Amino acid sequence: MERTFVYLKPNTIQRQLIGEVISRFERKGLKIVALKMLKMTMEQAEKLYEEHKGKDFYKPLLKFVTSGPIVAMILEGPRAVEVVRHVIGKTDPLEANSGTIRGEFGVTIRKNIVHASDSPEHAKHEMSIFFDTSEIVDYKLLLEEQF
């Protein structure tokens, strides 16, 4: 099974959309194997967005993602990275399809509700920024149980 990293941005928490967003992932068959609310540190933000260092949106992005609480999670399932990217929609909410998380709830490119890893390799790196392996829980869903 593939795992991917997702976090809900501060505006998602402020708009009380946590349950709505998480339920969309669960309805697609993804399993939450790690979940926590935290305030992202500047060090975590710099590691997460290091590929954008030097770009004009880098500092405002770091300021935004460290401005309030986030909900970080690891989701597991077949083709988890691809499934999550499909569910959340394009980065720009104006270009995201209706029915996607960003298409329905996103406001701007920065305040687009959710961050999700764009590849299995990035997912591994991003998970390590926010979670120790001891925080990842391996379990079976009822649907996975053998009777």
UniProtKB/Swiss-Prot annotation:
Coiled-coil segments on the chain, per record: none
Enzyme Commission no:
2.7.4.6
Q: Where does ATP bind?
A: 9, 57, 85, 91, 102, 112
Q: What reaction does this enzyme carry out catalytically?
A: a 2'-deoxyribonucleoside 5'-diphosphate + ATP = a 2'-deoxyribonucleoside 5'-triphosphate + ADP; a ribonucleoside 5'-diphosphate + ATP = a ribonucleoside 5'-triphosphate + ADP
Q: Which cofactor does it need?
A: Mg(2+)
Q: Where is the active site?
A: 115
Ubl conjugation is among the record's keywords:
no
Q: Which GO terms describe its cellular component?
A: cytoplasm
- Care to name a GO molecular-function term for this sequence? metal ion binding
Q: What class of enzyme is it?
A: transferase
Pfam families noted in UniProt: NDK
- Give the chief site where it resides: cytoplasm
Keyword annotations from UniProtKB, A to Z: ATP-binding, Cytoplasm, Kinase, Magnesium, Metal-binding, Nucleotide metabolism, Nucleotide-binding, Phosphoprotein, Transferase
Does the keyword field hold Lipoprotein? no
Cross-referenced InterPro entries: NDK-like_dom, NDK-like_dom_sf, Nucleoside_diP_kinase, Nucleoside_diP_kinase_AS
Biological process annotations from GO: CTP biosynthetic process; GTP biosynthetic process; UTP biosynthetic process
Q: Where in the cell is it found?
A: Cytoplasm
Provide the family line. Answer: Belongs to the NDK family.
How this chain assembles, per its entry, is: Homotetramer.
Q: Which NCBIfam families match?
A: PRK00668.1
The protein's job, in short, is:
Major role in the synthesis of nucleoside triphosphates other than ATP. The ATP gamma phosphate is transferred to the NDP beta phosphate via a ping-pong mechanism, using a phosphorylated active-site intermediate.
Task: Identify this protein by name.
Answer: Nucleoside diphosphate kinase
Q: Which organism is it from?
A: Kosmotoga olearia (strain ATCC BAA-1733 / DSM 21960 / TBF 19.5.1)
